Each structure stands twice: as C-alpha cells, then as structure tokens.
Amino acid sequence: LVNMAFDDQVALAIAQSGGLPPLLALAREGTAGQKVRAAAALRNLAYTEQIASEIAALGVGPLVALVKSGSAHAKEQAAGCLGNLALVTRNRSAIQMAGGYEALSQLVMEGNQGQRDVAQSALKILAHADEVACVVVKG
C-alpha cells in the first residue's frame, strides 16, 4: 500500500473501499512494524487533498501518538503524514487540537536528523494556522 498510494487513482480506490480506518487502527494498535507501514501508507495517501481531509476527520490522534512515542521510523513517517495533512488548511486545527504542534516541536528538539527535518517541514506548514500561532505566542 505504501508504494501504491503514490498513484492518485489507486489512493482514491483505497480510501473509497474503506482502507483508511484499518490503517489508522494499525497506527494505533499494530505491532511496531505495522505502525511504521501504516503511517507510511497514510503519509503517501495524504498527498491527495480529499483523502487528507478524510484522514483528519477520522482522527489524527494515532499519528500524534506515534510522533510522541513510536519507533524511530514510525515517528518520522507519522510526522511526515501530519505535514501532508496540514497542507489542507482545514486540517491544521485538528492537528493542533490533538497535540500535534507540541509533538512535532519535541521531535525537532530530540529526534534524529531525518526526524528533525520532517518535523520542521510539518511545523512550517502548521505555522500558517491561527491556532498554532496562538500556541507559539503563549510559549
């Protein structure tokens, strides 16, 4: 699914056939390897605006949780997914409300180079959200 999700038609077929809830469930409750692959698939699926909106509507909590406490690879994939979700303006509030800003900020401070790069990119996108601007100002 990870590689297939790069094709827009296949990505839409995955979403329309009910593939998103099981991927979010795996991101939340799967084995370490399943969490990485689920986050990677969701990251690639989130390039499509319609799918990104659906993922955000289903809940970004599992992705934020992976950024906070997943394996090294899961953290990077989940951070990338949050960044892709944030490309859709209306998703930014959901990410902020789920603790995404704090989780990504922590990853920038404590992650490896790849994690830091992905988290910084996601934060740059999130910085355009009023909700995040309020958090930054409050410190």
Regions inferred by a protein language model and the residue ranges of each:
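Detector for intrinsically disordered, low-structure N-terminal pre-sequences
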Residues: L1, Q9, G59, L63-L66, ...
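Short, hydrophobic/charged alpha-helical patches characteristic of ARM/HEAT alpha-solenoid repeats
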Residues: V10-S17, G33-K35, Q50-L58, H73-K75, ...
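Buried hydrophobic core positions in alpha-solenoid tandem helical repeats
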Residues: P22-L24, P62-V64, A103-S105
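Alpha-solenoid helical repeat architecture
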Residues: A27-G30, V67-G70, V108-G111
